[in-house]
Design a protein with these regions (language model features):
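Long C-terminal subdomains/extensions of small-metabolite kinases
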Residues: 1-168
């Protein structure tokens, strides 16, 4: 079960390296980015089977996002909504330091040459070979197939009486 963002590819590889590191925080991620970039076998080929469409895409990362941001604060899914019954499949086509830095700004628009977003209700995602997979920041292992759908029932969360949601 994923509440936030999961992905296949280079970010999951980064999380795998980070989990085995002695350094934590942003500095730890920065240090682990070097072995990740040099040891990963990207780009990867992804096949996304949705209800009425089939997509075959290449990229360095395929994210499954119901929320907007990674834990690092990178805003990778600015149009994502938690309450619309859909999630976004984000295919990051290449590594671009400029575009990665751009995601750290609140209202940054995503460049279609960098990332492609597909908004869907359910999907079966397959890869040619097992690829690193993470769920909500936890490395799960390598996977060739991932099945994704929005759960029918909502998760109940306790909030203060005076809580006002940020969206309607």
């Amino acid at each position: 079960m994923c509440l936030h963002i999961s992905d296949l590819g280079i970010n999951a590889e980064l999380i795998r390296h980070y989990e085995h590191s002695n350094f934590r925080g942003m500095f730890g991620y920065f240090l682990q980015s070097f072995p990740t970039l040099f040891k990963s076998n990207y780009p990867y080929k992804f096949t996304i089977e949705a209800k009425e469409h089939r997509y075959v895409k290449k990229g360095v990362l395929l994210a499954i996002a119901n929320a907007n941001k990674f834990g690092t604060g990178a805003n990778v899914n600015p149009d994502g909504k938690l309450n619309d019954g859909k999630f976004e499949v984000l295919i990051f086509k290449r590594i671009s330091l400029f575009h990665i830095i751009k995601t750290l700004f609140k209202n940054a628009e995503m460049d279609s040459n960098f990332v492609e977003a597909i908004s869907i209700e359910e999907a079966i995602i397959t890869c040619e070979k097992p690829i690193a997979f993470q769920i909500d920041g936890e490395f799960i292992g390598k996977r060739k197939k991932v099945e994704v759908k929005v759960a029918d029932k909502r998760l109940r969360i306790a909030v203060p009486k005076d809580f006002v949601p940020a969206y309607n």
